[in-house]
Amino acid sequence: MQLVYPLTTERLVIRALSPDDVDRHHALFSDPDVVRYLYFGPFDRPAAQEHLARRSILDLPGEGGWINFGVEVKGEGILVGELAMGFISATHAHYEVGYVFDPAYAGRGYAAEGTAMIVELAFSGLGAHRVSGRLDARNDPSARVLEKLGMRREAHFIENEYVKGEWTDELVYAILAPEWRTLRGPATEFEFRK
């Protein structure tokens, strides 16, 4: 099943990634500040091309899989960030979200605005019961994004992951479908095709 694109918010266009995004994708994932708290990167151009090819999948994921989205500011026509949504568990109707944005576009609320749309997709379009986000505990801006969405911090794991040569703490945030509906009002309708 595929989502019909684009999705739009007040200021953003959320669309499928494509091989044409390679220059912007490389710029994002080669920036040490962008990848500081990610499990991977920075990437050289060939690694960025390979990474983008794996992320340019249109089908919604099965359990354990992820789908990635490109984000543009309306009227600008360039990739300014990427969103990700993982299908964690069918049994528990659990999805996870993630996001990466160009630092030149930081502080404008784009990460929260775009992520809100994919959280809405998980709940209204895909029937999620729970949506979560995980992050390096040092990544305060990322924590603020999830807090703006109404997610609560549910866990702080101490040195639970060994990433890029160091033990790191991880925070887990989450929100349930009834909580989301209370915050956001009526469900959004999404269009899908087979």
PLM-predicted stretches and their roles:
Residues M1-A104, L121, G125, E159-N160, ...:
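GNAT-family acyltransferases
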